[in-house]
UniProtKB/Swiss-Prot annotation:
SUPFAM superfamilies: Anticodon-binding domain of a subclass of class I aminoacyl-tRNA synthetases, Nucleotidylyl transferase, ValRS/IleRS/LeuRS editing domain. This is Leucine--tRNA ligase. It catalyses: tRNA(Leu) + L-leucine + ATP = L-leucyl-tRNA(Leu) + AMP + diphosphate. The keyword Transcription does not apply.
Length: 831
């Protein structure tokens, strides 16, 4: 048989394909893998994401769908600016070079993208539209500017959204984030908190884990606000938020955030005290939940940290008893949650209990329960109210409803929901981003740029060695004229957070015209299958859901949910390698040392990361094994949602398997002149069952199971010798989504002028799948002996007995039986 010249095969097959054609008469299917940042190099982790999407796109085309499968570049961002500083290259040039390189890599692996729709977010043709969106949001009251205390990354010298602060550090730089107050633009995502939360119920095609993460981040708390008057200050009060209003009679103190307005208004803290609390206050993105602990998804352990409070000079009055309660400024009360003020009921809240113990505050139980241990708070929402005046004798839920009605009727409070979700800060102090289309005029104040003057583009000549934002220091770009009065004005020198660009790109792909074309969006949106990492659950996916709603409100599109189904692929992992000094090595470095006889420590299989150097270069793999082997292996072992361990042995096995397929087909092609082999009924039933299972697995995106079925069919055809044009076509048709180059090449040999790409999927006979017989493979010491047909209801003993006759007099040491699949006899004597 001929050698497996995959490079020649890839070149041949790619010359046949046209991925830009579409038929609007067919039912649409929109499959989209999250578009990449153009870092310049694709690794195996990228491969898995994109191949999953490509397999699905090819399969759906074969089912007759009009498939939209586009690609683009998330091209703005800080790495390009860093390259400009470190390598003295303009961000645009750096980005364009990387895009060209990655485009070549993506095309080399046979991804069936419609390249005619390719977009780049750093192109003025793209960001002109998002500048229009921003102006529409501004007009609709969805965008606003205010002085705000922000998360400042001192290394990247930019503002970070709460979601971009992880354990107090910048999500990119890892620097400890500090607080600053500067003017910032915001989008009113908080106005959509309830809608975003309820919308999750309709997303039945999303993983529950992602929906839970978004639910926690939105952080809805149902409760009430209650007014506590301030002693000595007529008609002044503190409005507290609580999810447990029924425990009001157990209140022994009130506490406010260090950022509560009263701290400044009543001069409650010295500068030193204020700084102590600012440092001690736990991350404000982890919000307070009166029931018992934090409801957030990060820093959960902080609920156990020391509760620090500074006793103020004022007291507040209990709204029912009139008792005076001490007021603290405390490190566990957050300005961004509820009203920034709480009442403390130590007997029924773990955090309040810890605070009360530290400051020797009263602890009065107002819920009677079987629990008699007063050394611990009773936090469950059940029991009978006691020591609670008019609430005594009521069940907790009944008392909660009653107290809310009471405070509403006498005008000291009302039912209220609070949300953790804060408005999205979109200003970034960097050059390589989309300019914000507003100017500032001394006479007219802030003015939006006229739509006809868009896009506001970036200046080419920029000095990147200056500290902070290069646009702020540009000698000419920021100076312009006011669109209202014509007088001198200054441009806003901030640029949009790059998540602004990625929050609508899926809609831009719907039309080749650019921007959002409503009719095209009606045709293709929502995305039917969106594929990407679970690390985007809160950031990108939540922002995109909000942005879609904002675009809907402004009349651009008709949908509110952008992604019907979501697949979060698992990470690609690899062994780590270290030299004798403990330094991490790239796989090729480790191999080189081993060849020299030097010691290499092989570590556990971990997520691929540049820091541990356990990354595998995609170009090297494709060059050595071919695109099809890389595609086939990356989907072969685990379900797409699970992590995947890369190994040289695995990719080599996939390469050899594809070579085996090539040899099998060529064996048929070389012998077909001798006449077609008639496929027996038993083999037909087996093939029919494989097609049935394969179709089911493809529909369910169980791609590793589908790969197993390809193996099963190859084994069946090899063992039975049932090689015919019909059976070979079945093999190539189900192989094509996974190894398209080889399948296309062999299909051209099978029949002239036939292109496999886009041809109909193979059908199966439902009646044959109901057969009462099953065909098993009989093996001896792992080697194929013969196929054996048995009745489905045969016992294991009967099957083994029948199979044993096929190995004659061999001495059997052990029998491995896989129901419905195989009997393997391990024999010490050949017989």
């Amino acid at each position: 048989m001929s050698n497996y010249d995959f490079k020649k095969i890839e070149q041949f097959s790619q010359s046949l394909w046209d991925f830009s054609s579409c038929d609007f008469q067919r039912k649409k299917y929109y499959v989209l893998s999250m578009f990449p940042y153009p870092s310049g190099k694709l690794h195996i982790g990228h491969l898995r994401n994109y191949v999953i999407g490509d397999v699905l796109a090819r399969y759906k085309r074969s089912q007759g769908y009009n498939v939209l499968h586009p690609i683009g570049w998330d091209a703005f961002g800080l790495p390009a600016e860093k390259a400009a500083i470190n390598s003295n290259i303009h961000p645009r040039i750096w980005t364009e070079k990387n895009i060209a390189k990655m485009r070549t890599s993506l095309k080399s692996i046979g991804l069936s993208y419609d390249w005619s729709r390719e977009l780049s977010t750093c192109s003025p043709k793209y960001y002109e539209h998002e500048q229009k969106f921003f102006l529409a949001f501004l007009k609709a009251g969805l965008a606003y500017r205010k002085n705000s205390e922000v998360n400042w990354d001192p290394i990247d010298k930019t503002v970070l959204a709460n979601e971009q602060v992880i354990d107090g550090r910048g999500w990119r730089s890892g620097a400890v984030v500090v607080k600053r107050k500067i003017p910032q633009w915001f989008l009113k995502i908080s106005d959509f908190s309830e809608e975003l939360l309820k919308g999750l119920e309709s997303l039945t095609g999303w993983p529950e884990k992602v929906k839970t993460m978004q639910t926690n981040w939105i952080g809805k708390s149902e409760g009430a606000v209650i007014k506590f008057s301030i002693s000595g200050y007529e008609e002044r009060f503190i409005e507290v938020f609580t999810t447990r209003p029924e425990t009001i009679f157990g209140a022994s103190f009130c506490a406010i955030s260090v950022n509560h307005p009263l701290v400044n208004e009543l001069n409650l803290l010295s500068n030193a005290e204020r700084e102590i609390l600012r440092i001690q206050t736990t991350c404000e993105s982890d919000h307070y939940d009166d029931n018992k602990n934090f409801s957030g998804t990060t820093n959960l352990e902080k609920v156990h940290e020391q509760k620090l409070g500074i006793l103020t000079k004022i007291k507040v009055k209990h709204p029912f008893s009139g008792d005076e309660l001490p007021l603290y400024v405390a490190n566990f009360v957050f300005a961004e949650y509820g009203s920034g003020a709480i009442f403390g009921c130590p007997a029924h809240d773990t955090r309040d209990f810890a605070f009360a113990q530290q400051y020797n505050l009263p602890c009065l139980r107002v819920i009677s329960a079987k629990c008699t241990n007063t050394a611990l708070p009773y936090c469950l929402e059940e029991g009978v109210m006691c020591n609670s005046n008019f609430l005594d004798g009521m069940q907790v839920i009944e008392a909660r409803k009653f107290i809310i009605e009471k405070i509403s009727s006498i005008g000291i409070g009302e039912a209220k929901n609070s949300y953790r979700l804060r408005d999205w800060g979109i200003s970034r102090q960097r050059y390589w981003g989309c300019p914000i289309p507003v100017v500032y005029c001394e006479k007219c104040s802030m003015q939006p740029v006229k739509v006809e003057d868009l896009p506001v583009t970036l200046p080419e000549e920029v000095e990147f060695t200056v500290q902070g934002n290069p646009l702020e220091h540009h000698p000419t770009w920021k100076y312009t004229n006011c669109p209202k009065c014509g007088g001198p004005a200054v441009r806003d020198t901030d640029t949009f957070d790059t998540f602004f660009e990625s929050s609508w790109y899926f809609a831009a792909f719907c039309s080749k015209e650019g921007g959002i074309v409503k009719e095209s969006c009606k045709r293709f949106l929502p995305v039917d299958m969106y594929i990407g990492g679970i690390e985007h659950a809160i950031l990108h996916l939540l922002y995109a859901r909000f942005f879609t709603r904002a675009l809907n409100k402004c009349g651009y599109i008709d949908i509110v949910e952008p992604f019907r189904n979501l697949l979060t692929q698992g990470m690609v992992c690899h062994e780590t390698y270290q030299n004798s000094s403990g330094e991490y090595l790239y796989p090729e470095e480790a191999k080189s040392l081993l060849e020299k006889g030097e010691k290499v420590l092989v570590g556990k299989i971990e997520k691929m990361s540049k820091s541990k150097k356990n990354v595998v270069d995609l170009e090297e793999i494709v060059s050595k094994y071919g695109a099809d082997a890389a595609r086939f292996f990356i989907l072969s072992d685990n379900p797409p949602e699970n992590s995947f361990g890369w190994s040289d042995r695995g990719i080599n096995a996939s390469f050899k398997f594809l070579q085996r397929i090539k040899n099998l087909v060529e064996r048929y092609l070389s012998s077909k002149n001798s006449g077609e082999v008639q496929t027996g009924q038993n083999v037909k039933i087996q093939i029919n069952k494989i097609i049935c299972d394969m179709t089911k697995y493809m529909d369910e995106i169980k791609l590793n199971c589908a790969v197993a079925k390809i193996h099963e069919l190859v084994n069946l055809l090899s063992a039975s010798g049932a090689l015919s044009k019909e059976t070979i076509h079945v093999l190539l048709r189900i192989l094509e989504p996974f190894a398209p180059h080889l399948a296309e090449y062999l299909a051209s040999k099978l029949e002239n002028n036939v292109i496999l790409y886009g041809s109909p999927w193979v059908a199966y006979n439902e009646v044959l799948t109901q057969s009462d017989a099953v065909t098993l493979m009989v093996r001896k010491n792992g080697k194929f002996v013969q196929l054996l047909e048995v009745k489905k209801d045969s016992s294991e003993e009967e099957i083994i007995s029948q199979a044993k006759r096929l190995i004659k007099n061999a001495v059997v040491d052990k029998v491995i039986y896989v129901p419905g699949k195989m009997v393997n006899f391990l024999c010490s004597s050949p017989g």
